[in-house]
Amino acid sequence: MPLSLSTNTLTKNGSAGSGTFQDVSNILLAEAIDNIEPAAPNKELVTNITIPSGHYQVTVPIYGRTTAVALSEGVDISPVQGPEIANVVTQTASEHGVMTFISDRLAYQGNDDAVAIVGEQHGRAVGRLLDQDIIGLFDGFSNSIGSAGAALNLNSIAVAVSFLRSDDSTYGPAPNPINASLHPEQIRRLITDVAGQTNSITTFGGEPIPTGLSEDIVKNYMRGRDPLFGVPIIESPNISRDGSDDAKGAVFSTRALHLAIENEIRAEEERDASLRGTEIVTVGVWGQGETVDVWGVEMLGDAVSLS
């Protein structure tokens, strides 16, 4: 059921004006685009692919590795068949959206606040869904580090990074950039480990914080995207916790996952005379998937909140 807004829902702000319904869509779209990025940090961590008009899917070929050999003078070089395609990934897109009904009375009274709120809610809702769709891919990585009930630590990140950068499979080491997308509570435990502190709300700072790298990391905590082992640590609040308060983040190359976008976001309105109002619809069309499995590592760890 769509969200319904009327004059009984919000206080009037501003005076009546002409061209109300035309203005509604313009204001809404601006607000929706403005609010989609903060709600979906993982979108910029994966490969974004545009599905061109007239196409219903995209095909992504993944090329394998070619081997060079030492040569002998006067001896012909054996040809290498190529380029070798190690895998082909196809991706389609589907619609995702939300609708809100705004009554005539609210619109006629020039309540621009109602429209702005609708835009904010729509943008955050679509962005949150897109983010959750990408996060849902983390569980698909075959390689996993950590365990339920145990906190991730500095060594967890080091192991993940070293695996991605030294893998010698068909696809080769994971290409840069590599990012870590983790639950806020997983990140807090990393900082606690770096600082040499006890994982407690009352005892942080009870032990001296080592100078150097540990001190810098603690000072810059929550500044955002400070790297560990050259990998930016991204806070992803949309990562959910299971019934045991464990969360699954990931360390992965941008090229490990992809997001195919047909229509990123659009807002439209439709007059409903019998309901005496206007329906505002915001829709995004996308599909997401895994490109190369060994270029990502799932990070499982305790994410319970301290009380």
Region spans (language model):
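Protruding loop/beta-arch "assembly-hinge" segments enriched in small, turn-prone residues
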Residues: M1-A39, G224-D226, S240, A247-S307
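N-terminal "assembly arms/tails" that initiate or stabilize quaternary assembly
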Residues: M1-V88, V294
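Signature of extracytoplasmic/envelope-associated structural regions
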Residues: P2-G19, D23, A32, T50, ...
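Short helix/loop capping segments that flank catalytic or ligand/cofactor-binding pockets
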Residues: A68-L71, G110, R189-T192, N199, ...
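Short acidic, glycine/tyrosine-flanked loop/strand segments centered on an H-E-D-like triad
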Residues: P83-Q109
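Alpha-helical scaffold segments that mediate packing/assembly in large oligomeric complexes
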Residues: S103-P173, E298-S307
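Extended, solvent-exposed, turn-rich assembly/linker loops in the middle of proteins
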Residues: G140-Y221
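Extended serine/threonine-enriched, polar tracts that run as long, contiguous segments within proteins
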Residues: K219, R225-G243
